[in-house]
Amino acid sequence: MTDVEPSPYGDCKFVARVEHIKTFIQAIKSICFNDYGMVQVSEDGLRITVEQGKSIQATLFMPPGAFMEFRVQDFQCFGVKMNVLSECLSLFGSADCSLRMMYRDKGDPLKIILYPHDDDDVSTECAIKTMDCDEPIDYDQNLKDPDLNVIFVRGPNLSKVFNELEKSAEEFEFVTSPNRPHFKITTVGIMQAVFSVEVAKTSPMMMMFNCKQTVVARYKSQQIRMTNKAMQSATKVAIKTNSVGLLELHLVMQGDSQEEIFIQFFIIPLLNTD
């Protein structure tokens, strides 16, 4: 009889390793706007989704290729406290660390092990309580319209535009159009003070421009501001809107090893009061 070598991870149904966690921590912190997040793991990769009511949703996505190691058995889904996850990942401060995540089965904790690169004799392990959670809202189905407006822009440029906008604004108005102004952001602040930024489709910050209809929609400033942390670290951003103004911001963050982490925001427009 041949002995079968036991797995070093026991009966874990999910095991993953990230060699450098700086970008992963930035991504986690950029979506910590609610207490709880839903973790989904499949052969497609890792997703962590956070929602606030039915007005904004953010999903962090890492494909298997973004990990040094990625193993999953069946589809795994569980909830975690986002602030606990963020704090555990930040235990070594700004020190460069590798990360191992392990999850055994429903009701078991998510184990996080950090290994600082500058000290081979040190590591720390956290066991994060998991819980049952509801399925996230599937906004993606609402953005399958062939007449969708799609714009790709350079992340640092868009972040600069947002930083120039009025900080006390109560609402943001987005205009995407095949005609001028091709892409316009207007803030409406206290006493209805208005400030606008226009970006032509020929602007150097534009990477792709494909708008088939004029869409004008307003959003709560607070929700747009929730994208700031991710925006500051993004290399490029896809902006998508459908005919009713459902807004998707799809951001790409690049890690130290050139791996890509994706952050996807869905923001519900305010009702048209015209």
UniProtKB/Swiss-Prot annotation:
Subcellular location, principal: cytoplasm
Classification via InterPro entries: Cell_cycle_checkpoint_Rad1, DNA_clamp_sf, Rad1_Rec1_Rad17
Cellular compartments per GO CC: checkpoint clamp complex
UniProt KW Nucleotidyltransferase keyword: no
Compartments (UniProt record): Cytoplasm; Nucleus; Nucleus envelope
One biological process term in Gene Ontology: DNA repair
Protein's UniProt keywords contain DNA repair: yes
UniProt keyword terms in alphabetical order: Cytoplasm, DNA damage, DNA repair, Nucleus
Tissue expression notes: Expressed in ovary.
Pfam families: Rad1
Family affiliation: Belongs to the rad1 family.
Subunit and partners: Component of the 9-1-1 checkpoint clamp complex consisting of Rad9 isoform A, Rad1 and Hus1-like; the interaction with Hus1-like is direct. Does not interact directly with Rad9; this interaction is probably mediated by Hus1-like. This complex probably also forms with Rad9 isoform B, however 9-1-1 complex containing Rad9 isoform A localizes to the nuclear periphery.
Protein name per UniProt: DNA repair protein Rad1
Organism of provenance: Drosophila melanogaster (Fruit fly)
